[in-house]
Amino acid sequence: MLDNVQLKPISGTFANMLISDTGIVNAGLKDWENDFKMMKAIGMDHIFIIRTECEQNGIRLSAEDPRSTTWKEDKCILDMIFRLSEEYGMTVYLGGPQSITNLHKGDWHKEVDDNKRYYDRTVEKYSHYKCFKGLYVTLEALPWHFNFLDICTEVLQYMRKNFPHMKTFMSPGFGGLKGDMSSRYNVDEWVDIYGRYFFERVAGLLDYCAPQDKITCPACHYGEILDNGIKEWYLKVGELFKRCNIELWTNVETFQQPFPGHGEPSGVYRQIDYRSLYMKLSEASPLVKKIITYEFFSLMSPNTEWGSSRRLLARYLEMLGKDPAIIDEIYN
């Protein structure tokens, strides 16, 4: 354990109902209810619903698919998220659609129009929920030749104009991909280019931004903790956000990014090693306003596909000085 390090707790999570890149959960209503009970018990009170509509090569997936629930209480999985969030006192940020075909064809104006129509429809549909307090720009991590900054800017402008009562949120990644889809920006390049071409443009439109932290390796040599560069990211991005009046949060990813010597190929996203999570939390805590994660339901919950997720949750609670016995009380 680290001495004199005060960790901020994870106080929110994404909810990914369509893409199974971090594992297939096959949760039923009781499983979801237990997850919400657990989150409430440990201080997670924000839900960021990601990718509610997806399209690729003409194939579409929807969080409003009536086959997504096998219980009568909810017509679809998206209805359930809103209902349980209301019941357990959560704050919901709703993310929009994403069409890979639009992006690959360079039809970014259609992507903007699809987002506008989606938010018009869903804000009206779910506006009666008191928990519904924010909108989330889902498209956030594609390279320059897909015009993703133009899309995000126009969607944020539409949100602010048409839904001024809603807070706005994004979660792009540190070290975003360059146009070659391989190399990444270093921190100074990221702050300069993302600053000039995006964040300065959306000053006053974007309330909160939680960059995906990406750095996983808990670098250490003979017991001495080494600098892995993540602190520099928080410091320099924090300065940029302060100039743009954007509150700096962080998305501490709870899936394992491959790092040298770990023996896993890229694209394998199981739950994180608890030492990596400890490193991420200790570095971010003094420098950000809020910590959220991608994501509790498929990586930290005992309901996940991954066998050690229950133990990851137990180690996380120990980091915060909490008794992991609550896991057995809720999940048996």
Question: PLM ranges: what are they?
Answer:
Residues E55-D74, I100-E111, P260-G267, W306-S308:
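Surface-exposed, active-site-proximal loop segments in enzymatic domains
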Residues M1-I49, L61, Y129-F132, P324-N332:
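Mature N-terminal, pre-catalytic/accessory segment of carbohydrate-active enzymes
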Residues L7-F14, D45-F48, G89-Y93, C131-Y136, ...:
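Structural preference for beta-strand elements that scaffold enzyme active sites
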Residues K130-P143, M170-F174, W190-D227, F296-L299:
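Aromatic- and acid-rich polysaccharide-binding/catalytic face
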Residues D35, H46-F48, L206-H221, K236, ...:
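Substrate-binding cleft of secreted/luminal carbohydrate-active enzymes
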Residues K72-Y88, D107-G134, I151, V155-Y158, ...:
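An active-site-proximal structural segment forming one wall of the substrate-binding cleft
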Residues L29-I100, N147-M170, Y222-F241:
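Aromatic-lined substrate-binding rim segments of carbohydrate-active enzymes
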Residues P97-N102, Y118-F148, C209-Q212:
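Active-site groove signature of glycoside hydrolases
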